[in-house]
Amino acid sequence: VPLTLEDFEREALPTLETYATIPCQSPGYDPEWATNGHLERATELLAEFALSRNFEAADVTIHRLEGRTPVLCVTIEATTDDEETDDDRGTVLLYGHLDKQPPLLPWSEGLHPYTPVRRGDRLFARGVADDGYSTFAALLAVEAMENDGIPHPRCVILIEASEESGSPDLEAYLDYLKPKLGQVELMICLDSGALTYDRLWVTTSLRGALHAQLTIDVLERGVHSGLASGVVPSSFRVLRQLLDRIENADTGEIVLEELHCEIPEAVHIAAAAVAAEFGDVAAADMPLVAGLRTLGDSDADRIVRRTWKPTLSVTGMDGIPHVDAAGNVLRPFTSVVLSLRLPPAVDAERAVKAVRDALTTDVPHGARVSADVQAADGWSSPELAPWLAEAVQVASQDAFGKPAGFTGEGGTIPFLASLGKRYPGVQFVATGVLGPHSNAHGIDEMLDLPTAVGVTNAVATILEAFTTRNDQ
C-alpha cells in the first residue's frame, strides 16, 4: 500500500517541522558549530525519530569522531523470504544530509528560515528540501515495506552533517564505517534535483565544486583617496586582473584549460531531448529582472552549460564598506569568496592547482595575496543495470503516474564521487525534491510535500526490485 500524503503528515511532518526550527548551519558557515550544539541537536532529533520507527531489526547510532561533525547511521537488517543471508545480496546505502545553508535573510513576508510555514501542500523553511526530508523518506520507505510484508535488503541510512561545506568529514567517516557498511551494491542519494514535480527524476551527472577565499592587500591601513589614488594600485583592480586569468569577463567562459573536459555527445543528445519535451528548464525557474538576456544559444545549450561547463561566481566579499558608509578612502584590502563549478569529469586536485597558480603567481604590482583553495570532484552516473533501469521506470509510474526523467544537475554532492571510487561497479540512483521554486540555498526554500511522498514510494519500489533482481 503506497504511503499517502496523510501518512507523511502524521508520521513525519511534526518532527520535520521541529527540525526546521534548528539553525544547524553547515560548519563552513558556522565556526561555532561545535559549541552551540545546533548540528548535534538536529542529529539527535533525527536519531530519536529513527528509534521511534517499528523495524524488525535495526540499529540507530550517532557516530562522533574527534573534531568532526556527527553522522547518523541507521542499519536496518534484511527481511527475506528465502535462505539467503544479507551478504548474499549486498547492502543498499541511502544517503542524505542534515546541515543547512545560511539563512540568507530577509525572506518573503510571512516566511522565515527557521519558522516552518505550511501553504497548501508546500512547506517553507531552510533545509526542509535540502536535505531535511531525506531521513524521513528513507526510514518511511523501509518501514512501509516491513508493514506490508514486502522483503527488503539490508539498508544503511547515512545522514551526514557537513555536506553543504563540501563534506570535509565524509572520507574519515567512510573509513571508520567501512565494516558497518558492508558490501554496498546500490547507492540511493536523496539530495538531488527534479526538473518537474510530476515524475521521478534521476540525476545522470553532477558538477564538482571549487571554493577559494582570496585576499588582496595593498596598504597597511586605508588612505585618503585623493592622496593614494594614482600612486597605490587599487586592491579591487588587482582582483579584477586576477579574475581575468580565470574567466573571460565578456563571455563568462572559463579560460583555464584544466577546468574543462570533453563533453560526451550523449550529453548533447540528452539535453536536446529534455529541452524538446520540457522547454527552457535551465532558465525557467530563474527570477530574472526584466530585460535580462540569459546565456546560451538555445534551451538545450543552457542545459549543457549548467551541467557540463565550468563557471565562476563571486559569492562573498569583505573589505568594502556599505554604500551609505563609503568614505573617500583607498581601501587597504579586498577579500572575496569564489565559487567555481567544475564539469563532472574534471579532476578537482588539478583544478585546485590551476586556480591557485592563477591567483598567486606574478601578482600585479606585487600586491600581497593569500588564497585558500579547496575542491570536490564531480560525478557521472554509470549506466544503469537492466534490472535497475526497469525498476526506476516502474517506481516513477507507480509513484507519480509518469515515466522517469533523466538529467544532469549543476550542483555538487561529494559523496557520490567518493563512493564510486570506493566501490567500483556500484549502482547509483540519485534523485530528490529540488524542483521548480524549491529555492535551495536561496530565500523561501520550499518542500513540495506530494513530491516527498512520491520519492518515498519510489525508493520502496527500487528496494523491492533490488531484493528480487537478476544480476544478468
Where are these regions (language model features)?
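An extended, acidic, His-containing surface patch that forms the Zn2+-binding/catalytic region
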Residues: 43, 196-197, 254-333, 344-357, ...
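A short glycine-threonine-serine/GTX helix/turn-capping micro-motif
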Residues: 223-232, 324-327
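A short core secondary-structure module
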Residues: 172, 229-250
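Acidic, glycine-rich active-site loops and adjacent beta-strand->loop/helix elements
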Residues: 67, 98-100, 158-167, 190-195, ...
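Active-site metal-coordination/substrate-binding segment of hydrolases
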Residues: 52, 83-159, 454
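N-terminal helical capping/dimerization or prosegment-like subdomains
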Residues: 2-106, 333, 337
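Flexible glycine/proline-rich, aromatic-decorated loop/lid segments
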Residues: 203-217, 428-431, 435
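Acidic/histidine-rich catalytic neighborhood of metal-dependent amide-processing enzymes
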Residues: 127-205, 471
